[in-house]
């Protein structure tokens, strides 16, 4: 039983293959047309490249396993150039302190980011005091403790990194580390201008004759503070106190000297000239916005000429509607009066006539 093949080349050529057994037995590979020939050559080249890549990977794994990891040829030079400014090698090992021993393997050490307080701060010597670290040369080695003055001995304070730690073979001049003195506070001027709204008179400024009012000579580290005396409510209250604004009457000084422990020293109250002003009145409210103009009314179209109705007042008024007929006794009386002048007539027919008409 034959069927159409699944591969495109055989199907395009019109080949028919059996139901089973077509895998790997395509007939287009034996075709001599140009397209089939190019496809066959390309498949052969790709298979050869795959074999070469596999062999190269196996050889590289075998080489690394026998010789160990190696850096590229330019990697050591670049690493040494980049780390030469911030990395120093360890000194040579001296076994037993007798002469220089064999050169040990040099490892690179990166210094800490912050300035180091010195190796002697973290290690203790035989006497229990901070001594030289293991990175310094021994006592018998050149540049040891015997060749250095007592001023160089480590102190309990931060020190800059020493160049002899990185280069122990070079003898550098020994310089004593200066010891900074205690920090002295800088005194400030009394009553500096800090933007306060009050202005003091000349007698309220700190004077030279009163030692109690000169705190900066006794305590130079104190910050100038000018406390004010609160306004007593029992004294007279004026309009300013009624408004809720206390008026400044005087001031007192609090001594910061440790020798005066008797408490607060109050001074007689003196009147000060307040320089503050009453708050400005609130701004007037903005005027209301003007009302929008009414929309213009549309003009009515004129269907009649303007002089058409001017002659209507000359027309006579319409006559009133006729009144309905009414029969009353007054009408009969007038009629009787007119008939009496000609001749007398019997009253019964005259009286019956309106009755007949009404009937």
Swiss-Prot record:
Annotated GO MF terms: DNA binding; metal ion binding
Tissues of expression: Brain.
Gene Ontology annotations for the cellular component aspect, listed alphabetically: nucleus
PROSITE patterns reported for this sequence: DM_1, DM_2
Pfam families per the UniProt record, alphabetical: DM (PF00751)
Keywords, comma-separated and alphabetical: DNA-binding, Metal-binding, Nucleus, Transcription, Transcription regulation, Zinc
Gene3D superfamilies tied to this protein: DM DNA-binding domain
The keyword Transcription is annotated on this UniProt entry: yes
Annotated region (Disordered), positions in chain: 111-149, 262-359
Biased composition (Pro residues): 277-299, 315-325
Record carries keyword Transmembrane helix: no
GO biological process: regulation of DNA-templated transcription
Composition skew (Polar residues), residue ranges: 348-359
Localisation: Nucleus
Segments of the chain annotated as binding DNA: 7-54
Classification via PANTHER family: DOUBLESEX AND MAB-3 RELATED TRANSCRIPTION FACTOR DMRT (PTHR12322), DOUBLESEX- AND MAB-3-RELATED TRANSCRIPTION FACTOR B1 (PTHR12322:SF66)
Family affiliation: Belongs to the DMRT family.
Protein name per Swiss-Prot or TrEMBL: Doublesex- and mab-3-related transcription factor B1
Gene for this chain: Dmrtb1
């Amino acid at each position: 039983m034959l069927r159409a093949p699944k591969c495109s080349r055989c199907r395009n050529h019109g080949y028919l293959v059996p139901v089973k057994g077509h895998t790997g037995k395509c007939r287009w590979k034996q075709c001599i047309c140009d397209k089939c020939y190019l496809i066959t050559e390309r498949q052969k080249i790709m298979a050869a490249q795959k074999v070469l890549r596999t062999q190269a990977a196996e050889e590289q794994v075998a080489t690394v396993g026998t010789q160990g990891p190696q850096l590229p040829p330019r990697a050591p030079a670049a690493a040494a150039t980049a780390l030469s400014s911030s990395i120093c090698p360890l000194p040579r090992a001296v076994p037993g302190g007798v002469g220089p021993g064999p050169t040990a393997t040099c490892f690179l050490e990166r210094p800490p980011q912050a300035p180091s307080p010195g190796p002697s701060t973290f290690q203790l010597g035989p006497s229990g005091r901070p001594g030289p670290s293991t990175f310094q040369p021994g006592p018998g080695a050149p540049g040891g403790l015997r060749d250095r003055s007592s001023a160089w001995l480590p102190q309990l304070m931060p020190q800059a990194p020493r160049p002899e730690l990185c280069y122990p073979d070079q003898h550098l001049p020994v310089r004593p580390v200066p010891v900074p003195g205690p920090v002295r506070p800088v005194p400030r001027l009394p009553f500096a201008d800090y933007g306060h709204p009050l202005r003091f008179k000349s007698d309220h400024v700190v004077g030279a004759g009163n030692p109690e009012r000169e705190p900066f000579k006794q305590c130079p580290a104190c910050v100038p503070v000018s406390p004010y005396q609160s306004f007593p409510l029992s004294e007279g209250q004026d309009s300013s106190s009624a408004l809720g604004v206390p008026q400044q009457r005087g001031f007192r000084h609090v001594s910061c000297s440790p020798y005066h422990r008797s408490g607060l020293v109050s001074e007689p109250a003196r009147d000060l000239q307040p320089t503050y002003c009453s708050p400005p009145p609130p701004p007037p409210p903005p005027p209301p916005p003007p009302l929008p103009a009414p929309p213009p009314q549309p003009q009515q179209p004129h269907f009649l000429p303007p002089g058409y109705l001017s002659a209507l007042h000359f027309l006579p008024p319409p006559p009133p509607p006729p009144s309905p007929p009414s029969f009353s006794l007054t009408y009969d009386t007038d009629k009787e009066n007119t008939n009496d002048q000609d001749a007398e007539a019997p009253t019964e027919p005259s009286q019956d006539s309106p009755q007949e008409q009404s009937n």
